[in-house]
Every structure is written in structure tokens, then in C-alpha cells.
Amino acid sequence: MEWSLSQNKLLAFHRLMRTDKPIGALLLLWPTLWALWVASPGVPPLWILAVFVAGVWLMRAAGCVVNDYADRKFDGHVKRTARRPLPSGDVTEKEARTLFIVLVLLSFLLVLTLNTMTILLSVAALALAWVYPFMKRYTHLPQVVLGAAFGWSIPMAFSAVSESLPLSCWLMFLANILWAVAYDTQYAMVDRDDDVKIGIKSTAILFGENDRLIIGILQVAVLALMGAVGWLNGLGWEYYWSLFVAAGLFGWQQKLIFNRDRDNCFKAFMNNNYVGLVLFLGLAMSYL
């Protein structure tokens, strides 16, 4: 019986950390890999690559824990989130806090193997991960903070590899913020009606009927900024083909969200994984 209870608890932790739903980790991973490949340039040192890949999964898990902790009073009122581990009682608040601390400590131990500049930048990463879940109470732009949190691995990657933060770093960082606002607005469109009822703020609510147009503008800006990164670093035709393919994927997302159907908005959000992958493949092939 004890094993059964322990197994149930582990499964609850598994759901709390979203390890059963890797899309968030992948959306965090791709920009990290972009930055590592551009900063190196080419294949980065294997230890640095391993640290960042492990750090992505650990900090994404920590972010999910603190997000659910912040939303524990709201999630029970939203159909999609009512069965999450905290509102359902499968995980206690104390257990969630402890799990968050463990995940952050493991991440920090990895960062300690890198240079001082990267260690200092990691403090800002933790602050962004902690602050983001609470922003949806106070501003309609929590997605901007999410973009900064998901993109902070970019300056950290440049720092770890080259101990510098060139213009390419900040253009890529800005592109990631705009990309995150676009895809998380698609995600927020799924819950928009419920969020309005319970007082949660989001860009989907702020943009209203202009949501599709603004998402489109953001997507064009992402492509322009990533094109500038390619130009500054002398990347080859492989990279620009990847931008062309990414533009096609963005066009498909616009088709999916056209009628604002919840299921299709979620499919559009999920499709962004392929955008990140395609851009990484273009970068990687340019450095072969």
C-alpha cells in the first residue's frame, strides 16, 4: 500500500512538472540551441551543451511548479486546469514549494560549472521564472515576461560560450520575446472566456478582435529579427530557407486561428515547436 501511495505521489509530481507535456520545454530549448550555435559558432562545447539542455528541462519543470502554485486558487474554476495536482489535492502546497526549491538547486549546481558572468545572469533567470506566474494578476502583458523568461537562456548561452553579449544576442532575445507573445496569445485564446470570468489577464484579452492581426505582425517581426541575426553572422542559404519554411508555418497558424476555435488555437500553439526546430536546423546546417 505504501508503494502505491508513493507511486501516486510521483505521478502527481510528474504531472505538476509537465514532464508528460514536453511542448513547453521544447519552446524553451530551441532558442537556447539557436544561441549556442551562433555564439560558438557551430557545435558548442559538449559540456556547455549538456548543461544547457539539462537546465532547460529542470527550469521548465520549476517554472511549471511555481506557475501552478501561483494559480492554485484559480485553476479549480477553469475546466482545462481543474484536475491539476494542486487544485485537486494530489500535491500539497508544501510539497510544491519543496519540489520547486529542489529543481532550482539542481539547476544552480549545473550553472556553477560555468563562468562567473553566466552564474550572475542565472540570478535574473530565476527572478523571471518566479515573477512571471504572478504577472497575469496585474497586467495584460504577462506573455512579455514569459518571453523574457523563456529567452533569458540566450544571453546566458552567449555568456557561457564567448563571455560576451553582442548585438546578435539581443536581436535573438527580442525575437524570442515577440515569438513567445505570439504563441502564448494563441494558447491564451483557448482559455479566454474562462480567464475573463475569473479575472486573469492576458494578451488574448487585451488584443480582443485584433488578436490575429497582432499575432501576424509579431510573427513578421520575428522573421525580420532572425533574418538580421543571419545577416550579422554571415549565415548561408540553408538558414534563409529555414526562415522561408518558418514563414509558411506561421501562415498555417494564421489559418488555424482564423475562426478562433479553441482546439485549432491550441493546434496553432503546438505548431510553434516546428518553427523552433526548423530555425535550429537552418542554423546548424549553415555551420556545417
Curated annotation (Swiss-Prot):
Pathway: Cofactor biosynthesis; ubiquinone biosynthesis
Domain of life where this protein originates: Bacteria
Molecular function per GO: 4-hydroxybenzoate polyprenyltransferase activity
Topology relative to the membrane: Multi-pass membrane protein
GO biological process assignments: ubiquinone biosynthetic process
Places the protein is found: Cell inner membrane
Family matches, as Gene3D superfamilies: UbiA prenyltransferase
Name of a matching Pfam family: UbiA
Keyword Membrane (UniProt): yes
Reactions accelerated catalytically: all-trans-octaprenyl diphosphate + 4-hydroxybenzoate = 4-hydroxy-3-(all-trans-octaprenyl)benzoate + diphosphate
Primary residence: membrane
An annotated GO cellular component: plasma membrane
PANTHER family tied to this protein: 4-HYDROXYBENZOATE POLYPRENYLTRANSFERASE, MITOCHONDRIAL, PRENYLTRANSFERASES
Name listed for the protein in its UniProt record: 4-hydroxybenzoate octaprenyltransferase
